[in-house]
A protein has these predicted regions:
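Short intracellular "coupling" helices and adjacent cytoplasmic loop segments at the cytosolic face
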Residues: 24-29, 135, 143-167, 171-173, ...
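Hydrophobic alpha-helical transmembrane segments of ABC transporter permease domains
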Residues: 46, 122, 126, 134, ...
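ABC-type nucleotide-binding domain
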Residues: 379-380, 386-634
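An intracellular "coupling" helix at the cytosolic face of ABC transporter transmembrane type-1 domains
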Residues: 47, 154-155, 173-180, 184, ...
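A short amphipathic helical element positioned immediately N-terminal to and/or at the very start
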Residues: 34-49, 165
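Helix-loop-helix
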Residues: 200-214, 284, 288-365, 370
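Transmembrane helix-loop-helix hairpins at lipid-water interfaces of multipass membrane proteins
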Residues: 52-122, 202-207, 318-324, 330
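Transmembrane helices of ABC transporter permease
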Residues: 47-64, 112, 185-236, 309-321, ...
């Protein structure tokens, strides 16, 4: 199918496995809508309200313990008394000598230890709940993404790199999971800590609070400045990772072709090109994000120094008081040092985690791009009763192009009668596979009409339509499952008797019985542990079990040996009996008994008739026949 579309330049995005714009072109970058992405992520997290509420409660307890420990430090310092080293006497405050207090000391110490223990416990549960919430959230997201992928139109997967789609399903969702797990609790805790610390600092010293704001302002300015450089780099990095996955997928699935044509070095060079580009972009991103930590630490230490310096000046000169009118002393300065450090710590942590958060948001945006795609419409106006369906197919002046103004099929008009066998013949790119795509409604026609039993297929639900059509592809598609389940893919509720009858009709019962596990034999990916002929026989058995009214055979015997082809032909003869059959084949020996042969050339019907009639015309079909059977040049 791919060849036809490529030959006709019908893949607007470069075709599967190439990525948008072709193999070596960089995808266009879009500006990120951070607010929208964060809002949608929060909706996913909000689906697990109980867990999220528990996390919030635990974080609040941890934050309160942290803030209370700061006040405990103030009381602990003040419990040692206040001694005037200049006058060599204890300070008298409000008529009370500030002597050491054992009671206040032990009470403060006990409270401090209790706060630290509670912090440790809360941090453990914060990590645990955060991880569990991340797993639950991303599981739902991954399930939604997969459910969306299987409902997208075939045109979407035809025009998007499969490796990039896989990257969104795996890498991007994993990045979201890791970020939610490691940063969600930190973000909530950080917000509460900032609010709590700010309230305490203002209460005990508005002047020192203003001094602490210097580091906050610097942190915000640096983060905003560096994010302008980091955001496009991380977006490009994610796109390049999708290209790497696409390249790897192509090489793994096509490794035999690579080896057969001694293409290993070229393949390696192509991969190195992608890998080097990814590394260069990744290195730039990591250099910038890596500098965030040292810069934030410097700003934090600067703020620490400013609090020490101005706090000492205020205390010595008696400048500034608390909101209660209390003069700043050693206890308040000690508390302020710790509180101001905690005040800037969440901001520094968020700044250092910025690259991870940005990667997750980029991945989330890529995931949401797929989730926002329009799904295939399976509804229909007319309900089809399979038991009453005959299988008459009418193509009336059908025209279609994968790209606007570039038709692949032009004025295609053919009548296929119930139970008849029609063969489509033509060079690669002539439109044969497109006809199948249109009949299955993988794509919708641009003009004209396709009818089954006089009913316009555009009015039939796609489910009803496809339930009555079975397709046997040249490249047999099997899944990593048992033989039995692969055959029953055509009818999941089939009985054992129906299954056995299907494999007998498809001539695959004998080789199945020779296998150690017989029908319970587990197939490897793509059925690689079976021969090509055995795989095709299983797909025929699947079609037999589906018991369709209409059958499509897409070059189903063009890549097997003569003996296997005979088995497949016998199975197909049984399968096609009393069914409307459409065959796509380049090997004219398989279609000589067809009721109607349609010869296509560049999307136009050039000849129609049975085998003998077309030979007598001495036209295109005759030349194809002579080429295959007489060795004559066209």
């Amino acid at each position: 199918m791919a060849n036809e579309k490529v030959q006709n330049n019908r893949r607007p995005m470069g075709g599967p496995g190439r990525g948008p714009g072709g193999r070596f072109m960089m995808p266009n970058e879009k500006p990120k809508n951070v607010k929208k992405v964060v809002s949608r992520l929060l909706k996913y997290i909000g689906a697990f309200k109980v867990l999220f509420i528990i996390l919030i409660i635990v974080v609040i307890l941890s934050t309160l313990a942290t803030l209370e420990s700061n006040i405990a430090i103030k009381d602990l310092v003040e419990s040692l008394g206040s001694y005037d080293i200049i006058n060599h006497s204890w300070v008298i405050k409000d008529g009370v000598t500030q002597l050491p207090s054992k009671t206040l000391f032990y009470n403060s110490l006990l409270l401090l230890v209790g706060c630290y223990v509670l912090q440790v416990i809360c941090q453990y549960f914060t990590t645990l709940i955060g991880a569990y919430l991340a797993i639950k959230t991303t599981r739902k997201m991954r399930n939604d993404l997969f459910a969306k992928l299987v409902k997208l139109p075939i045109s979407y997967t035809d025009t998007h790199a499969h490796g990039d789609l896989m990257s969104r399903m795996t890498n991007d969702v994993d990045n979201i999971s890791n970020t939610v797990s490691s940063t969600l609790g930190s973000l909530v805790s950080g917000v509460l800590t900032i609010i709590g610390c700010l309230a305490i600092m203002i209460w005990y010293s508005p002047l020192l609070t203003l001094v602490s704001m210097v580091s906050l302002v610097l942190t915000l300015l640096v983060t905003a400045f560096m994010s302008k450089f980091m955001r496009p780099l991380f977006q490009k990095q994610q796109s390049l990772l999708g290209n790497l996955n696409t390249q790897t997928e192509e090489m793994v699935t096509g490794i035999k072709t690579v080896a057969a044509y001694n293409h290993q070095e070229i393949a390696k060079d192509e991969f190195n090109h992608f890998s080097d580009t990814y590394c260069k972009v990744g290195l730039k991103a990591q250099i910038i994000s890596g500098s965030m930590g040292p810069v934030m630490n410097f700003i934090g230490n600067l703020g620490y120094f400013l609090v020490c310096f101005f706090g000492a000046i205020f205390a010595i000169k008696g400048i500034g008081t608390t909101l209660q009118g209390e003069v700043i002393g050693a206890g308040i300065i000690a508390m302020f040092l710790k509180t101001s450090k905690q005040f800037t710590r969440p901001i520094n942590e968020i700044a250092q985690l910025y690259s991870q958060i940005l990667t997750a948001l980029t991945g989330a945006e890529r995931v949401f791009e797929i989730l926002d795609e329009k799904t295939e419409d399976f509804t229909g106006e007319i309900k089809v009763d399979s038991s009453k369906l005959h299988g008459d197919i009418d193509f009336e002046h059908v025209a279609f192009g994968y790209v606007k103004d570039k038709p692949v099929l032009k004025d295609f008009t053919v009548d296929v009668y119930s139970g008849h066998k029609i063969a489509l013949v033509g060079a690669t790119g002539s439109g044969k596979t497109t006809i199948v795509n249109l009949l299955m409604r993988f794509y919708d026609i641009d003009s004209g009409k396709i009818s089954i039993d006089g009913i316009d297929i555009s009015k039939i639900s796609k489910k009803d339509l496809r339930d009555n059509i079975a397709i046997v592809l040249q490249d047999a598609v099997l899944f990593e499952d048992t033989i039995e389940n692969n055959v029953k893919y055509g009818k999941e509720n089939a009985t054992d008797e129906e299954f056995k009858r299907a494999i007998e009709m498809a001539n695959c019962a004998k080789f199945i019985r020779r296998l150690p596990e017989q029908e319970k034999t587990m197939l490897t990916e793509g059925g690689a542990n079976l021969s090509q002929g055995q795989r095709q026989l299983l797909t025929i058995a699947r079609a037999v079990l589906a018991d369709p009214k209409i059958l499509i055979l897409d070059e189903a015997t063009s890549s097997v040996d003569t003996r296997t082809e005979k088995k497949i032909q016998d199975a197909m003869v049984k399968l096609m009996t009393n069914r409307t059959s459409i065959i796509i084949a380049h090997r004219l020996s398989t279609i000589q008994d067809a009721d109607l042969i349609v010869v296509l050339d560049q999307g136009v019907v050039v000849e129609m008739g049975n085998h003998q009639e077309l030979l007598a015309k001495k036209g295109v079909y005759n030349r194809l026949y002579q080429t295959q059977f007489s060795g004559l040049d066209t």
